[in-house]
Curated annotation (Swiss-Prot):
<protein>
    <recommendedName>
        <fullName>Small hydrophobic protein</fullName>
    </recommendedName>
</protein>
<dbReference type="GO" id="GO:0055036">
    <property type="term" value="C:virion membrane"/>
</dbReference>
<keyword id="KW-0325">Glycoprotein</keyword>
<feature type="glycosylation site" description="N-linked (GlcNAc...) asparagine; by host">
    <location>
        <position position="138"/>
    </location>
</feature>
<keyword id="KW-1133">Transmembrane helix</keyword>
<comment type="subunit">
    <text>Homooligomer. Interacts with glycoprotein G.</text>
</comment>
<feature type="compositionally biased region" description="Low complexity">
    <location>
        <begin position="78"/>
        <end position="98"/>
    </location>
</feature>
<feature type="glycosylation site" description="N-linked (GlcNAc...) asparagine; by host">
    <location>
        <position position="152"/>
    </location>
</feature>
<keyword id="KW-0813">Transport</keyword>
<comment type="function">
    <text>Viroporin that forms a ion channel probably displaying low ion selectivity. Plays a role in counteracting host innate immunity by inhibiting TLR7/MyD88/TRAF6 signaling and STAT1 phosphorylation, leading to down-regulation of type-I IFN.</text>
</comment>
<feature type="transmembrane region" description="Helical; Signal-anchor for type II membrane protein">
    <location>
        <begin position="29"/>
        <end position="49"/>
    </location>
</feature>
<keyword id="KW-0735">Signal-anchor</keyword>
<keyword id="KW-1032">Host cell membrane</keyword>
<dbReference type="GO" id="GO:0016020">
    <property type="term" value="C:membrane"/>
</dbReference>
<dbReference type="GO" id="GO:0020002">
    <property type="term" value="C:host cell plasma membrane"/>
</dbReference>
<dbReference type="GO" id="GO:1902600">
    <property type="term" value="P:proton transmembrane transport"/>
</dbReference>
<comment type="similarity">
    <text>Belongs to the metapneumovirus small hydrophobic protein family.</text>
</comment>
Length: 175
């Protein structure tokens, strides 16, 4: 490419030269601008969806902590003195969604659902920042938690963003 000559000396004027360059590359410029617009739109939508998801999880954690605070009760004293077989169940959630069975005994699957046979039920609710708040709950609350779910299991979900771990530990004695 030869250097531009000064106007009046027989060369192409600068304005005309720029117009020629723009005409040759206008399609490329429009494609690049379109791609930048699409990329910024995708990033904005992704960030908005992620923000809404995290906000929803924080609300669930706050609601769980409020439910736990309202269901405080003193430790239950066993009323029977007959020897019983005790099965201890401890359920925690990992970073994946997994089902947690509502039954823990093959011959008497609904034992823990009977009010007088549930003992030492403890629910641990996280406050989304890694510390747990152990509280006492009664069998009615435990039944309601499981009955809110569809099917025969309770689903526990944990997010990498908000470690909202909900764990149930309970003992169920069998006569």
């Amino acid at each position: 490419m030869e250097p531009l000559k000064v106007s009046g000396s027989g060369g192409i004027p600068m304005k005309t030269r720029l117009n020629i360059i723009l005409e040759k590359s206008i399609n490329k410029i429009l494609i690049i601008l379109g791609l930048l617009l699409i990329a910024s739109t995708v990033i904005t939508i992704t960030l908005t969806v992620e923000y809404i998801r995290v906000e929803n999880e924080l609300q669930l954690c706050k609601m769980g902590a409020e439910v736990a605070k309202t269901t405080l009760e003193p430790p239950a004293q066993p009323t029977k003195t007959t020897p019983t077989l005790t099965s201890t169940r401890s359920t925690t959630a990992t970073f994946k969604t997994r089902p947690v069975s509502r039954t823990n005994h093959h011959t008497n699957p609904s034992c823990w659902r009977e009010e007088e046979k549930c003992q030492n039920i403890t629910a641990k609710w996280s406050n989304c920042f890694g510390t747990f708040l152990p509280v006492r709950v009664n069998c009615t609350v435990l039944r309601e938690l499981c009955d809110e779910q569809l099917g025969n299991h309770t689903t526990v979900q944990v997010s990498k963003r908000c470690t909202c771990i909900y764990a149930l530990n309970w003992d169920c004695s069998y006569a």
